[in-house]
C-alpha cells in the first residue's frame, strides 16, 4: 500500500492538535448524558460509541448516563397504554414503572453497552438499583392553580436523587470499565423510581466531582437575547437569563442540572448539540466546542 503523504500529514496534524486536550483531561472523569437524536440515528449512535471508546483509550474516564423517553413511548403505544405528562414529567403509575424499568434498564441500557463494546470498549450496564447506586425519594411537585394557590401534584413513581454510591462507580473506573447508567433509583423501602436522566447525570457528576458534565441534546445550545448560541456562561449570567425569560421552557430544568453541578464542585458543564456527529470529541478536543459551556472560571 502506497502512503498518501498529504492525507498522512492531515492525520498527524489532527492528532497533534488534540494532544493538549488529551493531556488536560487524562485521568479525569467525564460524565456524559446520552439522549435525544443521538440515540435514534444509527450513524450518530455509532459515532457516540466510538467517541466514548476513544476517550477511554487516551486515558480519560467516561461515565455514561442515558435517557430513553421515546423508546418508552413506543412500547407504551404498542401495548395500548397512555402516559400523561405534567411540565415534561411522565406520570408514572406502577404498571408504567414496570415498563419504564424494562425499557431503560433492559433494552436501551444493554444496546448502548453492546455498541460501545462492539467498538472496542469494555462497558458495563447498571441501573440505580444495582448496589443501591442511586438512592431516591419521591419527587414532590406543585402547580399554581387558577386562584394563584400552589397545589400538590402526584406524579406517581417519579423520583429525585438523594445520593449516589460513588464507590461503586469508582471501583468500575479503577477496573477499566465504562459505566453505563440507566436513570432509575430506589428508595429505602425498595420502591423503584423513574428519574429525569439530566438530573441523574448532574448528580453523578457532583458526587464523583467530575471534571466535566456533558448533556447531549437536540438543540445547538443555550440561545441568548439575540437568538444566537451563547458559547460560554457563568452561573451568575445563567441566573440573569432565567430571570429575564431568555432561558425558558424545557431548557430551564436542563440548564438547572448543569448549574447545580457546577455550583457543587464540577469543574464545568456543557450543553452539547448531540445531532452533530462526534459531538463528544468536538467538545473535548476543540476550543470552540459544539454547545454552551457553563463554568465558574469564565470571565
Swiss-Prot record:
Entry EC no(s): 2.7.2.8
Pathways involved: Amino-acid biosynthesis; L-arginine biosynthesis; N(2)-acetyl-L-ornithine from L-glutamate: step 2/4
Gene3D superfamilies: Acetylglutamate kinase-like
Entry-linked SUPFAM superfamilies: Carbamate kinase-like
The keyword Amino-acid biosynthesis belongs to this UniProt entry's keyword annotation: yes
Residues annotated for substrate binding in this entry: 68-69, 90, 194
Keyword Heme on entry: no
Regions annotated as coiled coil: none
GO BP, one annotated term: L-arginine biosynthetic process
Organism: Psychrobacter cryohalolentis (strain ATCC BAA-1226 / DSM 17306 / VKM B-2378 / K5)
Sites marked Transition state stabilizer: 33, 254
Name of the gene this protein is made from: argB
Superkingdom: Bacteria
Role according to the record: Catalyzes the ATP-dependent phosphorylation of N-acetyl-L-glutamate.
Membership in a protein family: Belongs to the acetylglutamate kinase family. ArgB subfamily.
Location in or out of the cell: Cytoplasm
Alphabetical UniProt keywords: Amino-acid biosynthesis, Arginine biosynthesis, ATP-binding, Cytoplasm, Kinase, Nucleotide-binding, Transferase
Predominant location: cytoplasm
Name of the protein: Acetylglutamate kinase
A single GO molecular function term of this UniProt record: ATP binding
Transmembrane segments annotated in the record for this chain: none
Amino acid at each position: 500500500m502506497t502512503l498518501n503523504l498529504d492525507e498522512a500529514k492531515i492525520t498527524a496534524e489532527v492528532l497533534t492538535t488534540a494532544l493538549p486536550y488529551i493531556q488536560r483531561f487524562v485521568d479525569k472523569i467525564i460524565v456524559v448524558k446520552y439522549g435525544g437524536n443521538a440515540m435514534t440515528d444509527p450513524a450518530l449512535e455509532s459515532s457516540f460509541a466510538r467517541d466514548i471508546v476513544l476517550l477511554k483509550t487516551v486515558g480519560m474516564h467516561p461515565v455514561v448516563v442515558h435517557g430513553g423517553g421515546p423508546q418508552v413511548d413506543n412500547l407504551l403505544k404498542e401495548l395500548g397504554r397512555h402516559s400523561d405528562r405534567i411540565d415534561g414529567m411522565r406520570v408514572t403509575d406502577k404498571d408504567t414503572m414496570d415498563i419504564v424499568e424494562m425499557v431503560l434498564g433492559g433494552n436501551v441500557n444493554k444496546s448502548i453497552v453492546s455498541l460501545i463494546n462492539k467498538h472496542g470498549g469494555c462497558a458495563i450496564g447498571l441501573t440505580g438499583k444495582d448496589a443501591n447506586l442511586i438512592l431516591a425519594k419521591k419527587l414532590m411537585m406543585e402547580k399554581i392553580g387558577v386562584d394563584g394557590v400552589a397545589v400538590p401534584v402526584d406524579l406517581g413513581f417519579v423520583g429525585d436523587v438523594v445520593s449516589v454510591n460513588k464507590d461503586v462507580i469508582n471501583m468500575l473506573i479503577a477496573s477499566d470499565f465504562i459505566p453505563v447508567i440507566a436513570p432509575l433509583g430506589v428508595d429505602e423501602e425498595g420502591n423503584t423510581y423513574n428519574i429525569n436522566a439530566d438530573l441523574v447525570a448532574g448528580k453523578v457528576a457532583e458526587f464523583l466531582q467530575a471534571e466535566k458534565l456533558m448533556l447531549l441534546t437536540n438543540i445547538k445550545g443555550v440561545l441568548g437575547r439575540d437568538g444566537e448560541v451563547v458559547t460560554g456562561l457563568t452561573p451568575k449570567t445563567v441566573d440573569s437569563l432565567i430571570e429575564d425569560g431568555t432561558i425558558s421552557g424545557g431548557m430551564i430544568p436542563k440548564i438547572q442540572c448543569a448549574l447545580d453541578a457546577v455550583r457543587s464542585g464540577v469543574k464545568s458543564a456543557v450543553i452539547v448539540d448531540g445531532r452533530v456527529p462526534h459531538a463528544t470529541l468536538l467538545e473535548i478536543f476543540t476550543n470552540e466546542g459544539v454547545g454552551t459551556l457553563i463554568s465558574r472560571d469564565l470571565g
